[in-house]
Amino acid sequence: MEADIALPSWAGDYLAWLATHRRAAALTLENYRRDLMRLAELADGRAPQALEPADIRRFVARLHGQGLSGRSIARILSAWRGLYRWLIRNRGTRLNPVEGIRPPKSPAMLPKALSQDQAKALLDTKPEADSALECRDRAMFELFYSSGLRLAELAGLDLDSGSRNGWVDFAEGMVTVHGKRGRMRTVPVGEPALAALSAWMDVRARLSAAGDGRALFITRTGQRMSAGAIRGRLRRWAVASGLGVHVHPHMFRHSFASHLLQASGDLRAVQELLGHASIRSTQVYTHLDFQHLAQVYDSAHPRARK
């Protein structure tokens, strides 16, 4: 339905503000654009200023009726709430009709993480004969798992140190990334990931010089790897691994956090490495850690099963 209507001017202005003042990542902006288009579609030509809480409740009911989960609707409401706060500050709008509107409840879902054996099997995969693409993909996936990066953070990495998009410091074994809300953070890079990145740098120098010369990860023709392209390469890699598990980029981040917490028990350190503004976002991994401990107990304790 989004293709049937153009992006309203108020949505375009808000997205431009997010990009300029919040330094929102491209993937974040695309998610906001999609959520704002939903609002425009549901409003059916009415301006945001003309909507009332009853309208928003009706929109939520429609979205839920279309099969969207409570979690997805919560994200959409967050985007709409932010829009209205911007309209109040910058356009003289008086009412935020989204305030106080809650999404339908959904069953709590834990993030899906690979086991340590699955992560090793996936990263040890040799999926195809094209050594250049395999070398690049291995470097990307090793870095995902080694440093717990978000997809947008990895896709945005540049070659030059000091880039506002992020870079890898090979000498120090660290990666600096441009995270959510423009926050920069620096995370260690493990030896296997550094070795894979070094091998990729040798291959990258021989690829086409056309296109984006700044990007760390590029296609065969020299263009920066897009988020969609990275997802597609990981799907191919996962199929070749024979794991029989649907693997997506964020699963590496979940696995990084879960395995680090299992080994260290240091929730605050994991929070810093993930770049979470709130410890509450990190606490979900304590549940994954408990699942791991329960599995160990069930498999190892002589009195675990009757």
Predicted regions and their residues:
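Conserved catalytic core of the tyrosine transesterase superfamily
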Residues: 1-306
